Amino acid sequence: MLIMKYLNNIKLSLVAAVFVCTGTVFTGCEDDLTISGSTDKLETVDGVYGYVRSAAGARELTPITLFGDKAGTGHLFFELTKAAEQDVTVTFKIDKDALEAYNEANNTSYEMYPVDKLSLANGGKITVKAGEKKSASMELNINAGGTIGTTYAVAVSATTDGGATVSTNNQTYIYLVKPQPTYPVRGTARDVKTLCFVEVNNENILNCGEYTMAKDGTPFFDVVSIFAANINVDSKTGRAHIFCNDQVSFLLKNADQIIRPLQAKGIKVNMTILGNHDESGMSSLSKEAAEDFAKELKAYADIYGLDGFDFDDEYSNYSENPSPGFEERSSANYCRLIYECRKIMPDKLLGIYEYLLYDAPNGSVEGKSAGELVDYMCYGTYQRYAKGREENFAGLPKSKYGPYSLKINNEYNGGWSGFNQETIQDLKDAGYGLQVFYNPEPRTFSYDHYFTAVSKVLYNDEVEWTGKYYNRTDFTSIQGTKLAYESYLGEWAATSSNSLYIYIDEDNNPRWWDWSGSQKFNVRIEEKEAGKSY
């Protein structure tokens, strides 16, 4: 039994039979449920105690969204305060009584999701193996059946059969469940799809939903990718796991306000996985590690309602003497990871960003080529057209490749630097299936004219901007100013970033030149052909 004198060391909220953690801090994507006070104090308690947690770092009351008639999945595991001295058998159960206790204690009125639509894998039984602190993940299957627009809850409690004690204040975990309508689908399928990577350290992905096609009002972007979560070595376990910084964590924590609005418009939302300066990476995972990492990715997709993942094999520090669970870098290992992802996530998008050829999956696994396993791949050197590059990857057709990625931030003058409309035409004519954009800065640039230059070629249509934009942490839009033809007329004060002076002789021949720094001058823009030119 739990001795009362240790309660102050545990520092958990005591609420009936429910582990209440609505005040927990969501600080990262790793399994990172923060209990008030240091969790290290749990190890000072006599005996071994356990508690129920969600995978993917999800705080309690994280909403799982069901789209139309599609099922959803929660991912739970059991964690001990100390390594188990023997195998600990854990039994999870769907617990309506625990939800009622939570409602009474917290003055809430959550309705239990229809129990006949819920089930636990393997009858709810799972094991914490001797010498370990955590069980594997247990899937909570949530079939469609609730009323759209209603917020439900599902409480899952746990008991153990020897080896550990589950105290009454940490035996239950609660997910919210939100049935939503089916995604809208674009009426006419596109031969060339658009993908936009958004640097969420600075920008809000909601901005991507403010650009629409003039003819039918559908979104300009097909896929938006959250850039980026990381693959890192877990210092406690030595395995590869997902790590998210505060900005990515904020976005996932607020998926209902940031991800769902884009999906409601028909835009798919992916999360990019990026290497992060240690030996873990897409190209170094062993077969078992790839299986394990794919399962973790699935937990993120299921819990946060992601449509898929993009993989960017930059910044990993691959080792020539890899640790257990890792191998020397190879495209074959990368292909194995994509195979494991495809096996357990057949309906999710899997995309690849590459710029070195060897930083991408290649070859085949179990008879499936890299080109068959991925949904698309793109060339990552910006403003350069890599026609024919797809031939380097096994089984990859042009329809799955994006050879012309455009960086559209300040570095490239909003995308105009290095942009060539004729290249877009050639991309389309050659049969390529993807046009990629990277790092939009919509609070700095008005992109409707730029995107129109692309869409006129690809879709014979123009792109309109709603005039609204979002700051990084905004859930509601700010009204901006839409520039029209007349907006540019008049006199403008301009400042150059630099200036070049060329000195000529009396015969008008250039003799020498010199940089002369920033200069200020006035420019007057006048109407030429009304509404069309200046």
Residue ranges and their predicted role:
Residues L14-T22:
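Hydrophobic alpha-helical transmembrane signal-anchor segments
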Residues T24-G28:
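C-terminal motif of bacterial Sec signal peptides marking the signal peptidase cleavage site
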Residues E30-T89, K93-K117, A121-G123, T127-Y534:
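Secreted glycan hydrolases and related glycan-binding modules that recognize and/or cleave
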Residues I3-V15:
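Bacterial N-terminal signal peptides that target proteins for export
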